[in-house]
């Protein structure tokens, strides 16, 4: 670890060194979706659930074309038993070139991260001194623009329908695209550095993605330009942060972030209900001094989880309403946004 701490375990997966920001998730299930979520690019994931790998790996659970996390830390990688499984977790990691460490005291590691905050770390088969040297030579997570590594390179057209949603791909999850497609709209995926290619759509959506949002001035500037058209705009996770930045909000880093599929979010504007939701974010928004209004908060720490605009058709969520993994109770957010598109998108 960056502070010199060493956690020993059994190497699984690829026999190589991986460096990344060490984070943790408290999700009990959903490790295939978690590992393939592009938002984890640049990070080493620690699973607090002690048994990971119970149901193997199946193609229909993946959120991208492969594992995007840099590495995995867990307590026990179990032998899989599931009729859809095509390989074990260990086999998947090895074939993907991703290292992992099992039999780690994950409780002690997570307690340290909660107390001192997330930090850089390295895992691999080498001595601690070699891992520390690799860590020193690697760029810090907060200084790398990861979205370029997970975005499409050229526009992609998907689906059929009267309405078109332009999706700026910062590392969009497959399940988000599916939520739009199953509602009968067309999706135009565009590279994160070519946002203007989606301006001709009925609405713009800024996707989830990895890394420090403060490095994405090139994207927030395009969003600011788009806002002038007064057309519908939505963002999830990183997209929520980018839209907030474009409208003047501040961004700050959380001590250890929200990464789980059991986080409560309270809707203080539309339904008045509290929902259990899926999260994966290490940064948060401070909208004070802007025209953005808060519609959802995380009751444990008061983090802003949803924003809207009283005069413009803008709606954002910091959490993942598509879930995958996790509760599906807030998928209605997509329906709410499409109603905005029906009213304002033509």
From Swiss-Prot:
Keywords on record: Amino-acid biosynthesis, Arginine biosynthesis, ATP-binding, Glutamine amidotransferase, Ligase, Nucleotide-binding, Pyrimidine biosynthesis
Domain Glutamine amidotransferase type-1: residue ranges: 164-346
GO CC annotation: carbamoyl-phosphate synthase complex; cytoplasm
Binding site for L-glutamine: 39, 209, 211, 238, 241, 280, 282-283
EC number(s) stated in the UniProt entry for this protein: 6.3.5.5
Subunit structure: Composed of two chains; the small (or glutamine) chain promotes the hydrolysis of glutamine to ammonia, which is used by the large (or ammonia) chain to synthesize carbamoyl phosphate. Tetramer of heterodimers (alpha,beta)4.
Any GO BP: glutamine metabolic process
Record region (CPSase): 1-160
Record lineage: Archaea, Thermoproteota, Thermoprotei, Thermoproteales, Thermoproteaceae
Gene transcribed to yield this protein: carA
Catalytic activities: hydrogencarbonate + L-glutamine + 2 ATP + H2O = carbamoyl phosphate + L-glutamate + 2 ADP + phosphate + 2 H(+)
Active site per database record: 237, 320, 322
Name this protein carries in UniProt: Carbamoyl phosphate synthase small chain
SUPFAM superfamilies per the UniProt record, alphabetical: Carbamoyl phosphate synthetase, small subunit N-terminal domain, Class I glutamine amidotransferase-like
A GO MF label: carbamoyl-phosphate synthase (glutamine-hydrolyzing) activity
Annotated organism of origin: Pyrobaculum aerophilum (strain ATCC 51768 / DSM 7523 / JCM 9630 / CIP 104966 / NBRC 100827 / IM2)
InterPro entries, sorted: Anth_synth/Amidotransfase, CarbamoylP_synth_ssu, CarbamoylP_synth_ssu_N, CarbP_synth_ssu_N_sf, Class_I_gatase-like, CPSase_GATase1, GATASE
